[in-house]
């Protein structure tokens, strides 16, 4: 049993995965097996329609799969934001067709959540190795200014052709690489959480994520250059991370402190040169900070700490609340979340 087959044995949602070159024609066969006698509805944006959506539509048609008219988002600034959830919800509410998402993070998350809203499953055709959310339980959507994870099942099936992913803009693969390398400090964080009894280790999920990292991350230059084999390794590592999250119904196997930096910057609507920053890039910078802290911790002679003195010096809740309000400049959105999350640790 290979790594993917082993991971699929524990997944709660995804039951089929095909990853390999020239695999796009297998979309029709997978659809018919997973959704017999159902209609299909291809969901894409302008870019993903061009690189794969039109082909998927034609492949399904050629195999005799009945289809609704494809739904292609036309906004060039499409984002995983609640307004677009409403847009796709409206489309799906008027049909019983099964969505076939063609895209990466944004298209997949929008389709994942809207499929759940409308009481059906979906499948996805990946177009980039840009993040680990394809096969993860839950969708990351911005609502009321906050990036939130909404509970919803992962796709029932997925197809990814690394030829297509390798041809995507290099920044997408770079984002995926950063998201995957973050699993190293995330794994260390989990070991620490397990050691203090906070979040118990799941050995299977831990190994699904960690065992293939060295291979998947071994050639960043090859990934950047669009080497198909290296992008395929990267994509497999990302998908395995998603499967681990499915198995545990938690993001714990694939994220740690480095992701908290990303969530904060999501709330601050971080932009670079006027454009939103990808999840992977934010996590990548968070990884630098997280690993720096871990290195500092390893260099600290914790056995010499005066625990009683540290406890006595701990600030009162009133002082902590004042710090939260000062740090977040009394912004009600940040203060409310900061208070709730800090109280949960006390």
Residue ranges and their predicted role:
Residues 1-98:
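ATP/NTP phosphate-donor binding region
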Residues 102, 131-135, 277:
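Active-site histidine-anchored catalytic micro-motif
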Residues 92-114, 118-128:
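A short, small-residue-rich loop immediately preceding and capping a beta-strand
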Residues 9-11, 34-35, 91-94, 115, ...:
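Solvent-exposed alpha-helices and their adjacent loops that cap or buttress functional pockets
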Residues 43-44, 103, 160:
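Short beta-strand/turn micro-motifs composed of small residues
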Residues 51, 109, 168:
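Residues that form or flank phosphate/diphosphate-binding pockets in enzymes
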